[in-house]
A protein has these predicted regions:
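Catalytic cores of extracellular degradative/oxidative enzymes
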Residues: 1-232
């Protein structure tokens, strides 16, 4: 029993969090209400949809070294296709519902989905040279100067697809859930990756696509979320 309890502490560690009323009354995420019996039919519908997704994630199963936290979104001829790759801001949806309800399952799902999307569904390599000057200042400067340049697409996300690492697209990356994981989970990696995506949006490398439609609203949303978190 002691061993089982100790393993549970590792697999499902305790989390400090506030009650739903505190999150909703703070207005940090705008106007939203905690779960209430006053709108029972609405709440049942919300619970059904979230539980349906969790059921399918377990049943299929949708988890593994590269897919843990994600799920598929297209059902055709009795089979599921296309990993969601966080489209559109699914981890943020789970964080919001956790704040409304305080449900541990929603917290764990949001946590896993944010960590998956920020590291699997985003572009991290190859990065450009970075001059540090923390060992041999002169040598570091020349090595950084001569190093090959990195990819201009670091920070770009990927759209839904049959593989996790295909279909790179500028209009398919959402930082709101990653920053929520930084606030609610204390996960600094979320803010770190969000900054990389913010840098990408500032470069505005959209290929043949202009700054219109989703690229426009995502640029604004992602950068506003980052500004709120960093004031930079």
């Amino acid at each position: 029993a002691d061993i089982e309890r100790s393993i549970d502490y590792v697999l499902d560690p305790a989390v400090a969090h506030a009650p739903p009323s505190w999150y909703t009354e703070s207005r940090v995420y705008g106007r939203m209400a905690p779960r209430s019996d006053e709108y029972a039919a609405f709440e049942r519908s919300m619970d059904y949809n979230f539980q349906w997704w969790l059921y399918n994630q377990e049943w299929e199963p949708w988890y593994g070294i590269f897919t843990h936290g994600d799920g598929k979104n297209y059902f055709f001829r009795n089979d599921w296709y296309e990993w969601s790759n966080n489209e559109p801001a699914m981890d943020y949806m789970w964080w919001m519902q956790f704040m409304r309800t305080g449900e541990p399952d929603y917290y764990r799902t949001a946590e896993a989905m944010s960590r998956h999307t920020m590291d699997v569904d985003n572009t991290h390599w190859p990065t450009g040279p970075e001059y540090r000057g923390d060992t041999n200042a002169a040598l570091d400067w020349w090595e950084a100067k001569e190093a090959p340049s990195g990819s201009p697409y670091v920070g770009m996300g990927r759209r839904h697809g049959n593989q996790q690492w295909t279909a790179m697209l500028s209009a398919h990356v959402w930082t709101a859930g990653w920053i929520a994981s930084y606030y609610l989970d204390g996960y600094h990696r979320g803010l770190e990756v969000a900054k990389k995506t913010g840098d990408y949006y500032q470069r505005r490398i959209f290929g043949k696509h202009g700054l219109t439609g989703r690229r426009l609203y995502l640029s604004v949303w992602n950068l506003v979320e980052l500004y709120d978190a960093t004031k930079d």
